[in-house]
Amino acid sequence: MAAQPLESPVRRTGGTEVRLREPVPEDGPALWRIARDSRALDVNSPYSYALWCRDFAATSVVAEDDDGPCGFVTGYVRPDAPGTFFVWQVAVDHAHRGRGLARLMLDRLGARLGGRGHRFLEATVTPGNTASTAMFTSFARDHGCKLSRTPLFGVEHLPEDHEPEVLFRIGPLPVPRRASR
């Protein structure tokens, strides 16, 4: 399965060229490693990352440099709300952090899915995750969208040491403009 490049895929981050593309199953081990090494995400099984790259490639994005994947955003379209896509995980390898790569991936994914008619983005964020809070807040602001925050899963829904999950709902996303002829 060939990886599908995304529009304007090249960006330099700290002197390193980074390309954005849809994931392929072979990316699974690298995504699992990036998630594990983040020390912030709930790490899923290695199998689930390979499966995600196969089944949800159209709603996910991978950043890669010459050494391979260095970041990712995984997501899916909500089955009971087809106009909404849910961002499952966002992670960037330590060597590429602090350069806006997570936000770049989110912007590209938002544009791609907005172009397919998805008007809302959702994600859950724990209260202690200030980086994700800042990223989703700036995404909403920069795209002229409303951002609502509501409790989704409290401590009664999660294992003992897990913080509650707050639902961030962003939208409606702007309809991408088509190039003039």
Q: Predicted regions span which residues?
A:
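Short histidine/acidic/glycine/proline-rich micro-motifs that form metal-
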Residues: 124-129, 154-156
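Conserved acetyl-CoA-binding loop-helix of GNAT-fold acetyltransferases
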Residues: 92, 98-111, 134
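Short amphipathic alpha-helix that is part of the acyltransferase structural core
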Residues: 4-44
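Conserved active-site alpha-helix within GNAT-family acetyltransferase domains
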Residues: 103, 127-149
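Conserved GNAT acetyl-CoA-binding A-motif
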Residues: 113-127
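C-terminal "cap" of GNAT-fold acetyltransferases
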Residues: 143-181
